């Protein structure tokens, strides 16, 4: 099976637990005979592409047009992830499944699903309501609603 992992963090970029989960899951899936491609954010002096013991890792820039607004930053990242996924599909063919890791990649995952008919598996590693003991402001409501949108797909 050809699996596309979408995540905003993958080693060496580790923000929380997502990077470790995606890394370990990808390695296990390779061991089980699957093809795994990861598209993630490029931070610092890391290559745009690497083969991490069988896991093909593609990193994309984020141009940070408005770095003070995290939601805008995430949307820009989703556009760049989507562009890279489209490029890979054009070159290598369609993926069998997309595994979207958390709300941060919702829009690229949803667009790929709708454009190519690729099913989505989604993992919300920590819900917004759980992290904050409820939803208390509009920013949290936006993240909560985006989590719902991803898991509804």
Task: Please identify what each model-predicted range represents.
Residues 100-105, 124:
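Short His-centered aromatic/hydrophobic patch
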Residues 55-86, 138-139:
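A short, charged, and often flexible helix/loop element on the N-terminal side
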Residues 123-140:
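A short, histidine- and acid-enriched strand-loop-helix "catalytic/donor-clamping" loop
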Residues 1-56:
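N-terminal subdomain of nucleotide-sugar transferases
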Residues 88-94:
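Glycine-rich phosphate-binding loop signature in dinucleotide/nucleotide-binding domains
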Residues 99-100, 151:
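Short beta-strand scaffold positions
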Residues 128, 140-153:
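Membrane-proximal helix-turn-helix segments that form the acceptor-binding/catalytic region
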